[in-house]
Amino acid sequence: MAPSTAMLIMGLLKLPRLRLATHFLPCGRLTFVQCSTMNSRPLRTLLASPDPSLPKTLTSTRLTLFAAPYVLEPTSPATCVPWPFWSPNPSLVKSIPWMTLSSNSGWSAKIPVSMI
């Protein structure tokens, strides 16, 4: 027999216990029904605290290199680039303040959009 099996038979080693994740679903106005769901990896706990020599139940982890992006500037600095060509005629489309529609969100319709 393996040492762990012998320890189980003698009662020195306790088996880990599985716990079901439970949650309550509302079924009526004031009543709740307890529903048990089994996760793909249920919680495992020992009945007694394990000796330091015994392996504990740990969550599986995975090392992922370069998971977070490098630290970069949030925006590029503002630069003024002149347009090389001038329009000979004035623009036909003009914004008239009294013709703007009122907004539903509470913000004024006359606030310009940021160009950053």
From Swiss-Prot:
Keyword annotations of the record: Signal
Signal peptide: 1-21
Further comment found in the protein's record: Completely overlaps RRT12.
Protein name per UniProt: Putative uncharacterized protein YCR045W-A
